[in-house]
Amino acid sequence: MEESHGSLEIDGSTQQDLLYPLFFQEYIYAFVHDHGLNVNGSIIYEPMENLGYDKKSSSLSVKRLISRMHQQNHFLFSVNDSKQNRFVVHKNRSDFQMISQGFTVILEIPFSLQKVNILEEKKIEKFHNLRSIHAIFPFLEDKISHLIYVSDILIPYPVHLEILVQTLYCCIQDAPSLHFLRFFLQEYRNWNSFITPKRASSFFSKENQRLFLFLYNSHVYICESIFVFLHKQCSHHFRSTSFGAFLERTLFYGKIEHLVVVVVLRNDFQKSLGFYKDPFMHYVRYQGKSILAAKGTHFLMKKWKTHLMHFWQCNFHLWAQPDRIRINQFSKHSLDLMGYLSRLRLNRLVVRNQMLEHFFIIDIPIKKFDSIVPILPLIGSLAKAKFCNVSGHPISKPIRADSSDSDILDRFGRICRNLSHYHSGSSKKKSLYRVKYILRLSCARTLARKHKSTVRAFLKRLGSEFLEEFLTEEEQVLSLILSKTYLASHRSHKERIWYLDIIRINDLVNFEFKD
């Protein structure tokens, strides 16, 4: 117990961070604006205005904001006259946006310094490749194809706003900054939108997405802290892909010790911990869903389920219902993760063996991790975006009157290429042809509606130039490398390509499966 205590302490310099004065520095908000201009070049899927950066930010507006922040009467909350003394962000929407962006940049400073130290200690090269969403799927192909049980885990959300603030207090012991954050969040009445993206208002999900992601990632680290601790205790047995995202939190050791008493109910922690060791256990998470796969028994997975539920409820006051953790056999269950439907597929390898005058036919089943595109949810997303109806029939999309034909073609073509680029890892490309057909015909109907013409006449006038806009990047690359005969074969539809430049999930594939 004494050995693990030292490994769970954080650097003392992190505990002495004084971040509050940075809220009144102009260069912080200038840095936020510059970051918004630069981030557009690295993210090819979302426009800059959807990432929460305002082009209208200026030095004058920042100076006025800082001046109002120095005036204490703007931040006083009066019980007798609450309507007149409300926080200034209710009067000025741009102030709320600038403060939320400044919050994120300032609070990210300690975590950024710790992340740099981790990368230097572990000597991780090409860290940008690990950021890719597609980097998870090769890991799944290599690691979990031989595992038996899979647990789909929906990470619980905090029942009160104060839990989020206390989470940051464990990592950033700067009381003025956290009090400012607490007051700032309480003034925004829709605080549930921080945790549940479904109920998030359009204002917070678009204009303040960076602050939402920071708070949510801090919350998720709370839920994953048990895996970080087990990784420390038995690193040669337990493998955690999420380890290293954040450092250990202050007082975490005391909570783990309390957990041993409440949940395990044994004094000898090392013997109790040995019960949970599994050399073939792997953990993967993206957004609010995680996967815990193991080669052990169903009884072991049930123990893990109970262990996680008590861990979240007793130590962090996170309510976790039993149906949020589902245990399934991997061979009979498909994983819905990041817009893909992944499953195990049995490929049979027939081998002919000859021994003297006798022949033997050996049928060898081989498990293969397979990922396909769930076409029905994807069509549902297209219908929600007004590209088609619920049955998949293409419809014309409302456009601005001043939009040119080239702008419309470029927009539809970019959406088609992005979807094809994201789903390049699917083993069944034919399912994407229906999506391309919907987008192509929806574009034709939109242009025909604009010119008050029929679709047939419009397609006849455009000819092959219209089809070139929907030629995907993968088809262009493969056409230069492979022969036309190979591209026309059935095998070309099964080729999977994982890209390491995809760091954001497309909104059209960011759906959730429903039972």
Curated annotation (Swiss-Prot):
The keyword Signal does not apply. Its main location: plastid. Keywords: Chloroplast, mRNA processing, Plastid, RNA-binding, tRNA processing. InterPro entries: Domain_X, Maturase_MatK, Maturase_MatK_N. It is found in: Plastid, Chloroplast. One of its GO terms (cellular component) is chloroplast. It holds the Pfam family MatK_N. Usually encoded in the trnK tRNA gene intron. Probably assists in splicing its own and other chloroplast group II introns. Belongs to the intron maturase 2 family. MatK subfamily. This is Maturase K. It comes from Ceratophyllum demersum (Rigid hornwort). The lineage of its organism: Eukaryota, Viridiplantae, Streptophyta, Embryophyta, Tracheophyta.
